[in-house]
């Protein structure tokens, strides 16, 4: 074989090898893009799941419907702004689907309502600034208004792990509290005897 033919053959082989290398590099780059994309999606899913858990920790665990029974010693309000049977609008969001819901007042009581923070007895996440626990739902509270920072034992069972939990008083408010029936604006679920909503959290329908 002449030197010229041998040279051309080598050059042709070299060009073919370069094409193969470029093709392989392209496949490698494409695979890398897919891997990185999959990792990103997986992380997003994990973050989304965590966020959903955080959002639901204080809402979804709340017992939506409750008993019409009230704590011993709780006094009915003699002249509430919203009488039993009144149709009202809820302007607070203790639970998802609550704000903006139409409700019916099923009870009205004069008491002291507290915002509390506590760690559930069932090992759940700490609940900060829960609204509301009333005077009659706190162990040995008597008639004396409790002060921010006071440590108390809860006797309410609005949420799982609440009853028997040690809590800290965040704030106190003498007010009329209401028990209401309403239909969730998000799920359509009928919630009966929700405890509690304060007078400031309601408006006339």
Curated annotation (Swiss-Prot):
One of the Pfam families matching this protein, by short name: DUF1541
Keywords, sorted A to Z: Signal
Residue numbers spanned by region Disordered: 44-82
Keyword Kinase applies: no
Matches recorded under InterPro entries: DUF1541
Signal peptide coordinates: 1-40
Compositionally biased intervals (Basic and acidic residues): 47-66
Presence of the UniProt keyword Signal in the record: yes
Superkingdom of origin: Bacteria
UniProt-recorded name of the protein: Uncharacterized protein YdhK
Organism: Bacillus subtilis (strain 168)
